[in-house]
Design a protein with these regions (language model features):
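Extended alpha-helical coiled-coil/bundle linker/stalk regions that scaffold oligomerization
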Residues: 420, 424-606
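Conserved phosphate-binding/catalytic loops in two-lobed NTP-binding clefts
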Residues: 270-306, 310, 572-606
């Protein structure tokens, strides 16, 4: 009886203190039609970002009705990712309270989240905190594995422990478990007698791209209709509907891989639409006629843009509109090289040849484009692009990170092990961190060691190099492993390493302290190594700079985070594919505050395109 009184007192107190706000539903009407929205996605090997562009019709004002895609953490919804977020993916079930309360209300799906994976900071945090060693709970980026359509051997796991069983649950949950099979294939694409839901989640690594795109779609759908977005971009009484999904791709992506990417995007749209109840669950989704059965219009997919060309458009648009006030003729005339003869039939100063190098996480892409003005004048000039040359290499920032780990981090650890008395330190390192080829608990622990120990230290070295004083010959990094780790590895990883160290140490030796391992890196030596071709990235940079030099370009644009490294900049200046004053580093490029990814009047480093 007393507990009932306490409960009623508590409820009455909450009722007095917390006023439930008025709930307002927004729908399209004749006076407030739905506003079409285009979503541009750049899914990279290392980082991902997106741009939302609303079409306000006659009220359009350049790029002012745009917003960066914001990914919200579902486990800590008060946190939003930075606009440029990691492409890491982790399986994690979205929970919105206790399910049986929803069932008692008469609806078993009161809250539906059409995805069972997390991306960005939440995925990284889940991976760093993972304690289980059965199977895998995620991957560094689905983009790397688009071609791998073979079901995995071990079941995928959710990365959080079940409090009752102390094991990680299998990575399958409502609503997606009823929309795909064990291999990750959507059921609506299969014959009726083969439509079995998920029992053993052995999704191929390629289908994880479908999962990632489902999560990004769900985040985008929530954002475009959020009160905050509608108030910021205008016309808050009008709902928003996705019209087009635009995927930017690296130049180096083969045609077959592009088609797989398109298929994954199509599957993600279908799964999200069916999970939300917007399209009949068992109906096919392939044709436009079948998609018209949807309650909410189905967006179209466009995949015509390559990443290097996107970087050129950022620069071209901003120069013409902002810096030259729409006077495109003056813009072209001021930058055209006087030492290059104009093409036949083209007046001098009415054409530009622009090259761009986009150094991403997984690919280095280059594009050379000829831009021609028509016969108009002032603000009525039309610019016609013609792609002259395009190339891409699957060598980029990830390879630079690997080089740093192999050149500086691993040798520092091996040296300290030898000083501690371990005679065959190289053999110990090989057994701990080498690839045995087996899929077992040791393999999972090796992956977690790389993720939780070596990669954060490697990133710390690159970040220090990026912000260093290039004119200081003594600049460098002098720290311990512990100094460079913002978050210590999990207990499982530490036990894995410490047991191996203790076993290899001579009897009576002092305890080996991993966090006290000293690291000394000279940034001048790193720059010299890049110039000498000792970094993997140097070879593709030599190749693309040679091509750019052959075309006598007017401007060279450098985009992507690795392009900020002093060694990379020194190498490009040394190769000098265009005069140094004609190289534009987009990480320092000035734009208006309203420009997407603008921070303090400059484009945020990384996804300059």
């Amino acid at each position: 009886w007393s507990s009932d009184v306490c409960s009623s007192d508590l409820l009455s107190m909450l009722g007095e203190q917390l006023t439930v706000p008025e709930v307002k539903f927004v729908t399209h009407t004749l006076s407030t039609p739905a506003i079409p929205v285009d979503l541009i996605l750049d899914v990279g090997n290392t980082h991902t970002c997106g741009v939302i562009i609303e079409d306000h019709g006659d009220a359009n004002d350049g790029l002012r009705q745009t917003a960066e895609l914001q990914v919200r953490s579902l486990s800590e919804p008060q946190f939003l990712n930075e606009p440029l977020f990691t492409s890491r993916l982790e399986f994690s079930e979205a929970r919105f309270g206790k399910q049986h309360f929803s069932v008692e209300s008469g609806r078993e799906d009161a809250f539906v989240w059409p995805s069972i994976v997390r991306v960005g900071d939440e995925a990284r945090k889940l991976a760093m905190q993972r304690l289980g060693t059965e199977g895998n709970s995620g991957i560094s980026s689905p983009r790397r594995y688009l071609w791998d359509e073979t079901p995995v051997v071990q079941d995928w796991r959710f990365s959080q422990m079940n409090s009752k069983t102390q094991r990680e649950p299998l990575a399958t949950a409502f609503p997606l478990m009823n929309l795909m099979n064990d291999d990750g294939e959507p059921l609506f694409t299969l014959p009726q007698d083969e439509r079995l839901p998920v029992f053993s989640p052995q999704y191929s690594r390629s289908t994880l791209m479908t999962h990632m795109l489902c999560e990004l779609l769900a985040q985008a759908l929530g954002q475009i209709n959020s009160v905050a977005t509608r108030l910021r971009l205008g016309f808050p009484a009008s709902p928003r509907q996705l019209r087009t999904l635009i995927l930017t791709l690296p130049s180096a992506m083969p045609k077959q891989e592009r088609e797989i990417f398109r298929r994954r995007m199509f599957e993600a749209i279908a799964i999200v639409w069916k999970a939300m109840g917007w399209h009949p669950q068992d109906e096919d989704f392939a044709s436009r006629k079948q998609q018209e059965k949807s309650v909410v219009p189905v967006p179209e997919i466009q995949m015509e843009w390559d990443e290097a060309s996107c970087g050129q458009l950022v620069w071209l648009y901003n120069e013409a509109i902002s810096h030259f006030g729409g006077q495109t003729e003056a813009f072209f005339a001021s930058l055209a090289r006087p030492d290059r003869a104009p093409e036949p039939g083209v007046q001098p100063g009415r054409a530009l040849r622009v090259a761009s190098i986009d150094i991403g996480g997984g690919t280095t892409d280059m594009a050379i484009t000829h831009y021609q003005l028509d016969d108009g004048s002032g603000n009525n000039v039309k610019i016609t692009p013609q792609l002259l040359f395009r190339e891409g290499f699957k060598v980029a920032g990830d390879d630079t990170l690997l080089d740093v780990i192999q050149r500086y981090v691993l040798p520092a650890l091996q040296t300290q092990l030898q000083k501690s008395g371990i005679a065959d330190a190289s053999q110990l390192m090989a057994s701990l961190f080498g690839d045995s080829g087996r899929i077992d608990t040791q393999a999972v622990l090796r992956q977690q060691t790389a993720l939780q120990l070596f990669m954060p230290i490697g990133h710390a070295i690159l970040a220090a190099w990026e912000s260093s004083d290039v004119d200081d010959p003594l600049a460098g990094l002098h720290a311990t492993f512990g100094d460079l780790l913002a978050q210590k590895p999990t207990r499982n990883v530490m036990n894995y390493l410490q047991q191996a160290f203790d076993h290899a140490l001579p009897a009576g030796s002092e305890h080996f302290d991993l966090f006290s391992v000293p690291l000394h890196v000279s940034f001048r030596e790193m720059r010299d190594a890049m110039l000498a071709g000792q970094f993997t990235l140097a070879a593709p940079l030599h190749a693309v700079c040679e091509a750019i030099s052959h075309y006598s370009c007017d401007i060279l644009l450098i985009t992507g985070r690795p392009g900020c490294l002093p060694g990379v900049q020194a190498l490009i200046r040394h190769l000098q594919p265009v005069p140094v004053n004609r190289i534009v580093w987009l990480d320092k490029y000035q734009v208006h505050e309203w420009y997407p990814f603008s921070q303090q009047g400059r484009i945020e480093i990384g996804r300059a395109h």
